[in-house]
């Protein structure tokens, strides 16, 4: 992170262009692959690929605030991902066949059995998607703010498209 946030490194146009390309591909590919998943843990893993793209978008903005924005994004992302994985792990019953409890379809109607855990999982997933009134929304807002202030319109568009796909 220190290496990427150093002004000398990102001042090189080739390095910054490479980061923009990787960020764009990461956001789009990660979200598209997450859409196709039936396994909740794999869905969260592919979502992680997209979130790395959002972090790289902030890094490529090369502003003084970028380090703070990256730190905020990573803290929010870590909290929500650990929370989501934790709830999925708790909800996975040891009595079911291996991998069966991890299917998205097996979470249908789980609210009536475990309402508190379901509410926590819902909030975590809404935050990962960047829905307003969640910490994930604030993080994505700062990612958009960083790219707009750097006049990186391509990355701003990629963040918006990636967020729309993740919904």
Residue ranges and their predicted role:
Residues 1-167:
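Alpha-helical transmembrane segments of multi-pass membrane proteins predominantly involved
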């Amino acid at each position: 992170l220190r290496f990427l946030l150093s002004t000398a490194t990102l001042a090189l146009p080739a390095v910054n262009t490479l980061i923009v390309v990787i960020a764009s591909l990461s956001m789009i590919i990660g979200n598209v692959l997450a859409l196709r998943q039936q396994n909740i843990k794999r869905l969260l893993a592919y979502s992680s690929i997209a979130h790395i793209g959002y972090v790289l978008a902030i890094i490529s903005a090369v502003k003084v605030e970028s380090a703070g924005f990256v730190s905020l994004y990573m803290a929010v992302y870590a909290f929500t991902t650990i929370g989501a994985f934790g709830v999925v792990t708790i909800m996975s019953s040891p009595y079911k066949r291996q991998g069966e409890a991890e299917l998205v379809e097996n979470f249908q109607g789980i609210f009536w059995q475990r309402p508190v855990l379901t509410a926590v999982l819902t909030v975590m997933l809404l935050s990962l998607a960047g829905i307003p009134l969640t910490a994930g929304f604030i993080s994505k807002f700062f990612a958009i703010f960083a790219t707009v202030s750097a006049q990186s319109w391509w990355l701003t568009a990629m963040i918006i498209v990636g967020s729309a796909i993740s919904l």
